[in-house]
Structures are given as structure tokens and as C-alpha cells.
Amino acid sequence: MIMTMMQTVRAWQQESDVEHRKQHKQRWRPDGAHISAAYDLNSDNDDGHHRVVHNQNNGSPNSSPNQSTSAFRQRQPHHPPTGQQPPRLPCTVTHFSAHWKTLLILLTLLSASTLTASANVTSTISPPINGSSTDYILLYGESTTSLVPALTTGLSGDGSGAVIEDEEDAEKASEYIFDRTDVRIIFITLYTLVFCCCFFGNLLVILVVTLSRRLRSITNFFLANLAFADFCVGLFCVMQNLSIYLIESWVFGEFLCRMYQFVHSLSYTASIFILVVICMERYFAIVHPITCKQILTAARLRMVIVTVWITSAVYSTPKFVFSKTIKNIHTQDGQEEEICVLDREMFNSKLLDMINFVLLYVMPLLVMTVLYSKIAIALWRSSRGLTPHVVQHQHQQPQQPSCQDIGMGMHNSMYHHHPHHHHHHHQHHQLQSAASSAGVVGVGLGGGGGGGPGPSLASGGSSTTSLSRKQSSKYEKRGVSITESQLDNCKVSLEADRPIVSACRKTSFYHHGHAHHQRAGNASVGGGSGGAGAGATHMSHSSSNVLRARRGVVRMLIIFVLTFALCNLPYHARKMWQYWSRSYRGDSNFNALLTPLTFLVTYFNSGVNPLLYAFLSRNFRKGMKELLLCSWKKGKGKSSSNSSMHHKRKALQTHSLPTDTTHIGNEQL
């Protein structure tokens, strides 16, 4: 097009030069005199003839006044020497007139070519309908709605802005990366795996926590809400996000488009907020157990969960308001295509994404890093004194452990609700005082009393002792009931609590067995030197388990923080690159693949949460196994459970000592 315009202008310039040479001619005579001639432009000389005015006065040209109005006369320069070429004529008004005409014609052609090129680009280049919603800008005219890509793919890749005229090049430039079969297979496989983790994994967590009586606690209540939020991510976000890139048109309607954007933001936001709440609950339960008992009651924790969901819903409301479906009629086959996008002209997209980056990534990551670091430091420091020598010294001079020391031993404090819990609260403290007077304290797990449920270890451990025959007959039934409650509490503990629970159970069984072998009839347990030596052996073994467990908790906390940071970083990094870097190209194949991959990694965090927070617990795995096998082992399991409880009660009443306390202590977890 530009070459055609240049050739046309050059032809017009040549015609103008010919016309100018016709109007101004200069003829030289052999004697050196010159003749100035001009064509008369009057209507009298339409035949093309011209008048020649001879000048004989020293060779200088002269024009008649009568002809000045009807003919154009050019004053000639002096006669040049013989043998030299005559000088060029200076530019005249006719030259300016011809140039102005040329400029006007050139400007007209340029404007016409610009309009034609823009019309061709608008009509021939259609946006990739399967692209991400972030790569579109919605332009609303007075009567029509057009959808234009943020970076037009119809331009050449060198950035020069030249329009692709070759049809073959245009087809290559408009080829969509997700139309390739291998790319489709890879993404369908990856999205299916993430969907299965999010859907089935979190659904299993919800069922196990809800149906298993042993897992009904406040901490698991948080995990169940986290699993529900991640379950919504798998149900409403994963496959819908994949469909944007694979199908040609949104077929679910405008309302479901709004609901998709709303639920996508709601579940993602609630999942992050619940992770922060779980982190805060663990911090108070481990580092400040007494404060946790006073502040984090069951009613308040339920209000916290309700507040999290309401806040997430309010925060996600703009996604419901600004979402809509857009019809694209500029397709090659003439069919209408519909996509679900956010109307980014109704709000500041950059500002909203920056707020999401701060509230949903930076602040949660900072809070979890600080609190989990404090938990790790507290557990690591408390593990320094857990050596056999120190434990033996503490056993020889027994003293009741503090709430903070016990709280540090439980990285996941559990909250329990027993029907007889508050009824036996007074007798529970009587037994504690009796055990303290006897000089022996077990590392038991007691339920919290008072105004609400509290941490099991933070409320003071219930001591397991053998009283005198007279006192034992009075509290025998209640004492057995409390011991069974302790065993149930031990079962609810998570994986990292196993060493301390083992110590609890070993100490309890040891004291009962030692009382059975004591034939002197004394009322206290472990008062003799033999009891101290045996107790030191058991406590030395349990202290090493506690040390390993606490260091394992530190490693697990690091995994929690790193998982959240790594899974959510790619999405926010891509957003920051899109807004703050000039090298970002939304039309490139790399970015076309990068966008769904960042979503996929974010969804993977919702799929891996149940693996980290639930499946690492042996107690949870037992509850899951019971849930899966309860259909055909229901009767057998019930009979075996009753028989086991009968033998357990008989063993406690007869004060018999099991032969392998380590096996029994670990079997319950």
C-alpha cells in the first residue's frame, strides 16, 4: 500500500515537472542572445500558440505592461559565458502550487489508507475466545459491544506494527495453543489429578471428622471447615477454569458465570483465612495454653468460623457484581461465541489485584511465618531438658509439671466434650489432690473444666494413682471412669502427640502394676526406691520420644509455611509481572500456557491441605479406616469393642501390669 502511494506521488511529480517545462522555456541563439518566452494563459490562447517577446536592449529581458495580466513572464538572469550551461530557473509560484497539490493528495491518501488498515484489522482479526479473562479489554460503544485483545495478535512479532497481509502468516499467528492435542491431554490430566485431590480428599476429611466420635474436637472442627472450603475449590473452580481454555464458548449462562466468579473467590479466600485461624489456635494452645483455655472457648471459636465465612463472602461480592457474559460476533465462521469475563471497565483491575496480593498472600504468609516460628522456637527450647539424667532427677524429686511445659508437649491441643465431664469435675480435683499428697504425678491427659472446654494438657493432668483400700472402694468406679476418659483423650491426639501420650499410658499402667506388687499395704504408689528406678527407665524412654516428636513438629510447621508460599506464589508473581513489566505479552504462547498453570498450582494447595493437616495423623487414618470398613464389620467391630473394654476394665480393677507397655501405648494412636 505504501509503495503504491509513493509510485503515484512520483508520477504526479513527473507530470508537474513536464508542465512546468512547457510553461517556462529558454532558447539560446548562436550569437549568445536569449529569448524569454511564456505561454499566455488567457482564454485567447487556448489553441496552444504562444507569443514570443524579443529583447534587444543589452540582452536584458523586458515585459510589456499590457501583457502582465494575461501572461506569466519570468525575468531571466544575465547571459552566461559561451560554452557554459544556462542556470536553472528559480522556484516560481507555479512550483508552490504544484507542491501544495501534491501534499494535499498525499495527506488524503495517507488518511484513507489508515482508515482502510484499521478497518481490515478490526474485521479480520478476532480475539482468541478461549483466552484468559485477564487478557481482554472490554470496549463499549454507543450501539455495539466489541471485544478486543489487550495485545493484538494480528501484528507482526517484531513489534513494528506492520499488518500481516499474507493469509498463511495470518493463520500461523492466529493459531491457538490449546487447539493442539498434546497440550489438551497434558492439561486435562493435570487438572483431573488436582480435582481428585481437592474433591475426594477433602470430602473424606469431612466425613471422617463428622462421623467419627473420637475426632470430634475444636481443632478438627477447624480442619473440617478448611476441608469444606478446599472441597468447594475442587467442586466449583478446577474444572470450570479448565473449560475456559478448552471449550469455544461459555454454555452455562450469565448467572452461573457470576456464581463461578463469586464461589471461586469465596472458597479461595475462606481457605486462606481458615489456615491463619488454625495457625493462631495452635500458637495459643502450645505457647500460651492457659490463655487458650480462657479465651478460645467453643462458642467463640464457632463465632470465629462464622466470621471467616461472612468476611470471605463480603470480600468476594464484587466478583459477582462485575462478572458478565460477552458475545463475540467477529469470528471467522460467522457464529456467535460467548465468554465469561470480568467487566474491567467498571473497577480498577490493577488496584484489586494488588489488594488481593497483600491481603491473601503477604499478610497470611507473614502471620503464619511469625507464629509458626515462635511455636518452633518454644518446642525446640523445651526439648533441651529432655535427657535421661534430667528425667531421672525429676522423678526422684517429683513435682507437678506446669501448664506451659505440658502445653508445649502437645503441638495439636484437642478439645473434648464428654457427657460426664463436668459432672465429675469436683471428684477429678479430689483425685488430683490425693495424687499430689501421695508424691506421684502421672503425665495424664485430662479434660478442661470451668466455663468451657479447654486444652487437654493445659487444664492440668489427671493423676492416676492407687489409693488405700478404703478410699479405693469409695472412688473405684469413678476412678475407672476417669481412666477410660484419659484413654479416649489419648486416642484423639494427633501424630506428634504420640510420645507424650505413650508416657501418660506407661506411667498410668506402671503405677497400677506397682501397686499390685507392693504387698506392704502402703497407700502411695512409687514410694519405694524400686518404683523410682523403674519409673525413671520408662520416663527416660518416653522423653526421647518426646524429643523426636517435637523436632518433627518443627519440620512439619516449616512444611506448612513452604507449601502455602510456593503454591500461591506463581499466581501473584504472574499478576505482578503483568502489571509492572513491559516485557509481558499476553498473546504469546508462553503466557497462554503460564496462566492456567498458575491457577493449577494454586488449586493444588487446596488438594494437598488434607494430606498435610489430616492424613499425617495415625488417629485420623484409623478413623478413616473405620469409616470405610464400617459397612461390613459393624457387628464384629461392636462386639470386639465391648470385649476389649471389658478386659480393660478388669485389668484396671485387678491392677495388672501389661507385659509390653510400649506396644499398648503406640497401638492407641
UniProtKB/Swiss-Prot annotation:
Keyword Cell membrane: yes
Protein name stated in the entry: Trissin receptor
Residue spans, topological domain Extracellular: 1-184, 239-269, 324-350, 574-595
TM segment ranges: 185-205, 218-238, 270-290, 303-323, 351-371, 553-573, 596-616
Disulfide-bond pairs as recorded: C257-C340
Subcellular location per the Swiss-Prot or TrEMBL entry: Cell membrane
Biased composition annotated in UniProt, kind: Basic residues: 414-429
Region (Disordered): 1-90, 390-481, 515-537, 635-669
Family in the record: Belongs to the G-protein coupled receptor 1 family.
Any one GO molecular function term: neuropeptide receptor activity
Entry superkingdom: Eukaryota
Keyword Methyltransferase (UniProt): no
Gene3D superfamilies xref list: Rhodopsin 7-helix transmembrane proteins
